[in-house]
Amino acid sequence: MLLRFTKMHGLGNDFMVLDLVSQHAHIQPKHAKQWGDRHTGIGFDQLLIVEAPNNPEVDFRYRIFNADGSEVEQCGNGARCFARFVLDKRLTAKKRIRVETKGGIIELDVQNDGQVCVDMGPPRFIPAEIPFVADEQALNYPLEVDGELHSIAAVSMGNPHAVLRVDDIRTAPVHGLGPKIENHPRFPQRVNAGFLQVIDRHRANLRVWERGAGETQACGTGACAAAVAAISQGWMDSPVSLDLPGGRLNIEWAGPGTSVLMTGPAVRVYEGQVRL
């Protein structure tokens, strides 16, 4: 059978988006891995699936597969594209929608200027909820990699993140250290690794090594986690403007117990069909 899909991106973080509300198919990890290959498939960072909800209090179910076939809890850049997609495809007439993910319920708001604001919910810091192996909760944790200690913040935005502060984003060891942090045994479900260079109280640069995808042009949940870590430790104040390789995201967070708001673009690239 042929499935219709849309290729989209949020700041260069690119997605294949499938509507499984009006189409019906059983998507398996092997399909994501096959389609995600940039040489022999469609090529993407993540596959986003739109489904009818299980929960009557939400509008849609939102599933995410990495290009390596692993299903993950959350994707912030994908959430913005998800909101744009369901509106463009007339699956809803609402500009503000609620969707369920493996990481919890999030709210998406398509603004008049085309930007999308995502209410990502409150960050989580309790190690067992990230999950991260630690004796007690702290703002910073020493993490040993190849005999060297690195200071990290550990945060969940519905998916796990480690945030490291660096002096210069251009020389940050994203490709050397990133995969080692991703697969560190203290993160039992693996982790996304963010490398943050603070410019001033409201501006910073960020690169993210994403779990199951490698370095991407942008990572929405990574931007949220980095902003939360920086505000928590007194390095920055809300609102935070983060420049990633693919462009800029704006993050607001009022402090513990409150939701993180992320605003950025969502762009449709092309429509296609793929054989299942």
Swiss-Prot record:
Site (Could be important to modulate the pK values of the two catalytic cysteine residues): 161, 210
Compartments (UniProt record): Cytoplasm
Major place of residence: cytoplasm
GO MF, one example: diaminopimelate epimerase activity
Example GO BP: lysine biosynthetic process via diaminopimelate
Annotated Pfam families: DAP_epimerase
Sites where the protein binds substrate: 13, 46, 66, 76-77, 159, 192, 210-211, 220-221
Alphabetical keyword list: Amino-acid biosynthesis, Cytoplasm, Isomerase, Lysine biosynthesis
EC number in record: 5.1.1.7
Pathway terms, separated by semicolons: Amino-acid biosynthesis; L-lysine biosynthesis via DAP pathway; DL-2,6-diaminopimelate from LL-2,6-diaminopimelate: step 1/1
Function summary: Catalyzes the stereoinversion of LL-2,6-diaminopimelate (L,L-DAP) to meso-diaminopimelate (meso-DAP), a precursor of L-lysine and an essential component of the bacterial peptidoglycan.
HAMAP family: DAP_epimerase (MF_00197)
Protein name: Diaminopimelate epimerase
Species this chain originates from: Pseudomonas putida (strain W619)
